[in-house]
């Protein structure tokens, strides 16, 4: 019989594929895991299964035609990405959206934040075995998607933001319905917390799992909830306010342990803060200062209204030129970042003075978070991989692009 040392030398780690057809793999993620028994020794994320060449496609389209591609990046909260691209193009053009358009944009970006956090919190609970939260969460997401549809005609890929404003104004009834929804939604968040926050099993699966220190968060290029969970109050809406966020009164929740449980708690609290911002937006839209146009009054950038086109030949020509050739953007380069639900979503836009972007580099927050899977998962059990993955909040549309 061989001695123990020879046996130990003959042992080798077990390698398995986690995904891409795995229910906890969130889309098309493929992880190659190296296991020593149940303990994870190495994680190798394989990306690219949802690569569609978005950045190259944007170079072939006019600035207006590029907007729908941003809906298809983080398709859980589409309008937040459109926001970054529109702000970047507006910066190059030297224009600013009217006040009402800014309020509508911020309102819908916060709806997107709640859409994303609801999906994440409830599916994270499902990944560790709780089956009730997703049913409650998806009921609320359905109502929010109806608000998307009533504004833009589409439940997911809205293409509602425009360079210089938004596509059309919101009907008063829709604003009232969003207001009423905000009042009732807080109760849903409380119910979710009753189920999860002090739940013994949920805490056992999340507390002290996937710990990220603040130094590690900065080193790996984390942003959003991943940084706030580690104790830094870094939120672009507060630290580098854009549009009308500077006027909004809200708090930035932070964690102290940097584990999965802290990140869950932050997302729950951020949903409450988003409702606060939405209520403020609605109040400001009802004031006289919040009335008016929802796009810039420049027919070289934003198409004229249908009524004008029926009366004015010049308006018809503007409309035709905008939708066939598009408008020209002055040469230059700009980087604009917004606080998307997943973290800092940035757009680096380079213009060469033509009607199409020369280069549009997308900085997806999930990409930086996914590359850290290896160092976060090492030493944890196989069952913890899905809990950690859930708390990173990764969507593959933006990772693979």
From Swiss-Prot:
GO CC annotation: plasma membrane
Protein name as it appears in the record: NADH-quinone oxidoreductase subunit D
EC number(s) per entry: 7.1.1.-
Predominant place of localization: membrane
Top enzyme category: translocase
Organism: Rhodopseudomonas palustris (strain HaA2)
Xref: PROSITE patterns: COMPLEX1_49K
SUPFAM superfamilies the UniProt entry points to: HydB/Nqo4-like
Reaction catalysis annotation: a quinone + NADH + 5 H(+)(in) = a quinol + NAD(+) + 4 H(+)(out)
Membrane topology, record value: Peripheral membrane protein
Record Pfam families: Complex1_49kDa (PF00346)
Localization (cell): Cell inner membrane
An example molecular function term from Gene Ontology annotations: quinone binding
Record field: transmembrane: none
Family of the protein in this entry: Belongs to the complex I 49 kDa subunit family.
PANTHER family recorded: NADH DEHYDROGENASE [UBIQUINONE] IRON-SULFUR PROTEIN 2, MITOCHONDRIAL, NADH-UBIQUINONE OXIDOREDUCTASE 49 KDA SUBUNIT
Self-association and partners: NDH-1 is composed of 14 different subunits. Subunits NuoB, C, D, E, F, and G constitute the peripheral sector of the complex.
Purpose of the protein: NDH-1 shuttles electrons from NADH, via FMN and iron-sulfur (Fe-S) centers, to quinones in the respiratory chain. The immediate electron acceptor for the enzyme in this species is believed to be ubiquinone. Couples the redox reaction to proton translocation (for every two electrons transferred, four hydrogen ions are translocated across the cytoplasmic membrane), and thus conserves the redox energy in a proton gradient.
Keyword annotations from UniProtKB, A to Z: Cell inner membrane, Cell membrane, Membrane, NAD, Quinone, Translocase, Transport, Ubiquinone
Coiled-coil boundaries: none
């Amino acid at each position: 019989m061989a001695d123990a040392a020879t046996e130990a030398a003959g042992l080798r780690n077990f390698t398995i594929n986690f995904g891409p057809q795995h229910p906890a793999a969130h889309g098309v993620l493929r992880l190659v895991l190296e296991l020593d028994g149940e303990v994870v020794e190495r994680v190798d994320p394989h990306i690219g299964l949802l690569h569609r060449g978005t950045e190259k496609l944007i170079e072939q389209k006019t600035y207006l035609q590029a907007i729908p591609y941003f809906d298809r990046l983080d398709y859980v909260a589409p309008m937040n990405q459109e926001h970054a691209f529109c702000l970047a193009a507006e910066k190059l053009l030297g224009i600013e959206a009217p006040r009402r358009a800014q309020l509508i944009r911020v309102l819908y970006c916060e709806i997107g934040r709640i859409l994303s956090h609801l999906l994440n919190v409830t599916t994270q609970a499902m990944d560790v075995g709780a089956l009730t939260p997703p049913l409650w969460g998806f009921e609320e997401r359905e109502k929010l998607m109806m608000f998307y549809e009533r504004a833009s005609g589409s439940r997911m890929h809205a293409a509602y933001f425009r360079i210089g404003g938004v596509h059309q104004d919101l009907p008063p009834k829709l604003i009232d319905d969003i207001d009423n929804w905000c009042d009732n939604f807080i109760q849903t968040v409380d119910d979710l917390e009753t189920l999860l926050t002090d739940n013994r099993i949920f805490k056992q699966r999340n507390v002290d799992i996937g710990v990220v220190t603040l130094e590690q968060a900065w080193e790996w290029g984390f942003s959003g909830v991943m940084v706030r969970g580690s104790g830094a109050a870094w939120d672009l809406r507060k630290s580098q306010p854009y549009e009308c966020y500077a006027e909004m009164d809200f708090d930035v929740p932070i964690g102290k342990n940097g584990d999965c449980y802290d990140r869950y708690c932050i997302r729950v609290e951020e949903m409450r803060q988003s409702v606060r911002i939405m209520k403020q937006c609605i109040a400001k839209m009802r004031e006289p200062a919040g009335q008016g146009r929802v796009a810039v009054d420049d027919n070289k950038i934003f198409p004229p209204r249908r009524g004008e086109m029926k009366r004015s030949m010049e308006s018809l020509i503007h409309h035709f030129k905008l939708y066939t050739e598009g408008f020209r953007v002055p040469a230059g380069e700009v980087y604009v970042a917004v606080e998307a639900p997943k973290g800092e979503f940035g757009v680096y836009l380079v213009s060469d003075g033509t009607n199409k972007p020369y280069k549009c580099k997308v900085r997806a927050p999930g990409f930086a978070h996914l590359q850290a899977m290896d160092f976060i998962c090492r030493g944890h059990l196989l069952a913890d991989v899905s809990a950690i993955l859930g708390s990173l909040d990764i969507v593959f549309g933006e990772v693979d692009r």
